[in-house]
A protein has these predicted regions:
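A shared catalytic/ligand-binding motif for oxyanion handling
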Residues: 1-186
Length: 186
């Protein structure tokens, strides 16, 4: 089964025009599951999600923004995936899903990482707790607010301890870091 997945830092969805752009793109791309980061929405409800997705056949999980900062929204087509469990953390929202057609069980985790390098270790610990709870296939997406390599950020010329920690987290958990597509680097 091919999954149409989208992970997108929307940089705010409080503006009605921005929501309309998001809705149109989700409709055009016919996604099965999406992760929207940095929603900046402090109270997400079903009407808000329905308006974005444009179909009643949805389920969703959210980590609401705190004082219009952050926020992660996962939305999926419930004709494709059945929700088995949800975990909402400080920096992530995770959902355990089963494919309706193939019964494949996997975890989809959306992240909006802390902007402070000193807080990154809390994100790694949070994700490891979810991994211990659901030791199966994962798809980990989002904006980690950290880079692995200096070439990923304009003007960055050297590795920082936080970059080494991020690379170590990825490698020690056998994750695959897919390249960024469709947007410029920060």
């Amino acid at each position: 089964m091919t999954i149409r997945l989208l992970s997108w830092n929307v940089r705010g969805l409080n503006n009605p025009r921005k929501r309309e752009v998001c809705k149109n793109l989700l409709k055009d791309w016919k996604c099965d599951i999406v992760c929207l980061q940095e929603t900046k929405v402090s109270s997400t409800d079903i009407v808000f999600v329905w308006i974005l997705w444009g179909s009643p056949f949805i389920d969703w999980a959210v980590l609401d923004a705190v004082q219009s900062s952050g926020g992660v929204l996962l939305i999926w087509d419930k004709r494709v995936f059945e929700q088995l469990d949800i975990v909402v953390g400080q920096f992530s929202v995770s959902v355990l899903l089963r494919g309706v057609v193939d019964d494949f069980v996997w975890a989809y985790i959306g992240v909006y990482g802390p902007n402070d390098d000193g807080q990154q270790s809390f994100l790694w610990e949070e994700l490891l707790r979810v991994q211990a709870r659901w030791p199966m296939a994962w798809c980990l997406v989002g904006d980690f607010n950290i880079i692995r390599y200096p070439s990923e950020r304009l003007g960055c010329e050297s590795f920082s301890p936080a970059m080494f920690a991020f690379s170590n987290f990825i490698e020690s958990n056998s994750f695959v870091d897919l390249p960024l597509e469709g947007a410029s680097f920060t």
